[in-house]
Design a protein with these regions (language model features):
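Single conserved hydrophobic/aromatic residue that forms the stacking wall/gate
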Residues: 203-214
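Conserved SGNH/GDSL esterase-like catalytic core that processes O-acyl groups on lipids
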Residues: 21, 25-110
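Substrate-gating cap/lid alpha-helix
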Residues: 136-172, 192, 197-199
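Loop/turn elements at helix/coil->beta-strand transitions in domains of secreted/extracellular proteins
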Residues: 28-30, 87-90, 122-127, 165-168
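Active-site segments of SGNH/GDSL-like serine hydrolases
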Residues: 94, 119-152
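N-terminal, intrinsically disordered, polar/charged segments of Gram-positive cell-envelope systems
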Residues: 1-29
Length: 214
């Protein structure tokens, strides 16, 4: 008797990378922003008032999953608690500047763990890994830890976490950099934080954002 034919297993299709488009502010109504003092600035001075912000001045990847933070209209919660209470369509993470004194690979591993936590709790959310913003030339040239070459090295490692399908990388440094790749003097008063007049949330809107209708 002829041997029975064995059916080839059906391969799991790869997710199709979706197109990008610009959107209006309502797109961010189900967005969660996770970050440090720079994200605190977006929450306080930005125009995306319906978004949710898990942000604290000293937040970093080492405590992001355990630290309790005051979240508007929610209360003081840890990130896992927040992720279990609300459903988000997109999650933006800007962390790393406070951690620069640590090993960059270790920072990246902790960041990756944070991304995994978000993904497990919000399987349908789009995750945006955000580049850390540069510092001004006076700080970059004198600070052995908080300098732009080191920030660039960390950003390069964080960019590798994006897959272009469900996790994306956003770098807005070119909007604030001078010709030497430093934070422009006219954009910051402390060589670290951009002025409040630069609404970073509007920059998020102008960034190409994944089109959900495809």
């Amino acid at each position: 008797a002829a041997p029975e034919e064995t059916a080839e297993p059906t391969p799991t299709p790869e997710p199709t990378p979706l197109q990008f488009t610009t959107v209006d502010a309502s797109y961010f109504d189900d967005a969660l922003f996770i970050g440090d003092s720079r994200t605190v600035g977006i929450a306080e001075y930005g125009s995306l008032k319906n978004a949710t912000y898990f942000a604290d001045v000293g937040l970093n990847v080492y405590v992001a999953q355990t630290k309790a933070v005051a979240v508007k209209n929610v209360g003081t919660v840890t990130l896992p608690q927040l992720l279990s209470q609300k459903t988000f369509g997109k999650v933006y993470i800007m962390l790393g500047i406070n951690e620069l004194g640590n090993d960059l690979d270790d920072i990246t591993a902790k960041f990756s763990s944070l991304v995994d936590t978000v993904r497990a709790a919000q399987p349908d959310a789009i995750i945006f890994v955000e580049a850390n913003l540069h510092v001004g030339p006076s700080r970059s040239s004198t600070d052995a830890t908080f300098n732009n070459p080191r920030i660039d090295k960390l950003n390069e490692k964080l960019a590798a976490l994006a897959d272009g399908k469900t996790i994306f990388y956003i770098d807005i440094n070119e909007l604030f950099d001078d010709e030497n790749g430093n934070l422009r003097a006219d954009a910051s008063g402390d060589s670290t934080h951009v002025y409040a007049k630069y609404d970073l949330s509007l920059i998020h809107i102008s960034e190409p954002t994944r089109l959900l209708s495809i």
